[in-house]
């Protein structure tokens, strides 16, 4: 792509050992009906045929560029893409997922008419062999980032992938290296900049459920569950979420459930709440 051409949207796609799904992912992005878009494929040290597929795509379409790097994990790959992004807006797609056709076109058309918007969230579908659950969004603009945080219980849908962000929001924000549930860490940092946030019912991001993935295994893995709890704790602190805040108690319930899981697996207490050890012990005995 000519460097003098204005780029509306940068799509960052981390790639790691996904030769079976990469073509579907990239093809779905190219079918979005957006010309002034760049696709950044970040090969994160793949050991299969993914690097060659990335290079083949870049030769076939000038809007696609490739970064080859040593393995650093999902956050590191996203960060590498952010560093190279030139678009007014940036978004993320995981390489085993895909988009409904025309999703970006409709969202960018809306953004061009609502230039004050900094973060636009759209529907996400969980797709698997036995489930298809849609995370719906209504057409709404929020008075403040905190209003969005509480009104939508954003900690429950902090996914990085079903949102379009003004790229400048990431000027001093990056995804945390070496952590799972990295999205829960990152979204509050962006919201602290008090961006204008909106949600849209248009289109869908199709998240392909993987029974062997982090989300599926988190409740069975004490390390992942601890990191989930720690992410929720930091998110609540960053967004000044009090127990008595509107809907705020729900994030504390999520913390409690993670703590109960951790105690059941390892007997460890992470939350420093009064009587939490007794609550965990009773729950473990009575379940």
Spans of model-derived segments:
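Glycine-rich, basic loop-to-helix element that forms the pyrophosphate-binding segment
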Residues: 69-85
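Short aromatic/hydrophobic "clamp" motif used to bind/position activated sugar donors
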Residues: 90
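The conserved acidic donor/metal-binding loop of glycosyltransferases
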Residues: 94-98
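A conserved acidic beta->alpha catalytic loop
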Residues: 28, 43-52, 70
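Conserved nucleotide-sugar donor-binding catalytic segment
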Residues: 146-221
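Flexible acidic/His/Gly-enriched loops in nucleotide-sugar-dependent glycosyltransferase catalytic domains
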Residues: 103-177
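C-terminal subregions of glycosyltransferases and related glycan-biosynthesis enzymes
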Residues: 159, 208-287
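N-proximal low-complexity "stem/linker" segments adjacent to membrane-targeting elements
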Residues: 1-31
């Amino acid at each position: 792509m000519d460097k003098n051409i204005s780029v509306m949207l940068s799509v960052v796609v981390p790639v790691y050992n996904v030769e079976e799904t990469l073509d579907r992912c990239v093809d779905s992005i190219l079918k979005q009906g957006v010309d002034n878009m760049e696709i950044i494929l970040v090969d994160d040290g793949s050991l299969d045929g993914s690097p060659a597929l990335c290079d083949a795509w870049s030769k076939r379409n000038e809007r696609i560029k490739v970064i080859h790097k040593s393995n650093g994990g999902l956050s590191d790959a996203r960060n590498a893409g952010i560093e190279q992004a030139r678009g007014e807006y940036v978004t993320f797609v995981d390489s085993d997922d895909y988009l409904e056709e025309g999703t970006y076109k409709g969202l960018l058309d809306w953004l061009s008419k609502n230039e004050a918007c900094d973060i636009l969230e759209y529907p996400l579908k969980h797709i698997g062999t036995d489930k298809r659950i849609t995370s719906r969004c209504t057409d709404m603009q929020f008075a403040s980032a905190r209003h969005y945080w509480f009104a939508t219980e954003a900690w429950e849908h902090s996914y990085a992938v079903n949102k379009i962000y003004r790229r400048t929001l990431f000027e001093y924000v990056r995804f945390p290296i070496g952590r799972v549930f990295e999205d829960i860490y990152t979204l509050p940092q962006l919201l602290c900049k008090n961006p204008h946030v909106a949600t849209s019912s248009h289109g869908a991001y199709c998240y392909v459920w993987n029974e062997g993935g982090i989300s599926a295994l988190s409740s069975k893995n004490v390390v992942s569950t601890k990191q989930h709890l720690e992410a929720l704790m930091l998110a609540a602190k960053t967004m000044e979420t009090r127990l008595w805040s509107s809907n705020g108690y729900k994030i504390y319930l999520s913390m409690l459930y993670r703590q109960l899981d951790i105690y059941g697996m390892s007997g460890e207490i992470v939350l420093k709440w009064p009587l939490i050890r007794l609550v965990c012990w009773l729950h473990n005995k009575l379940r």
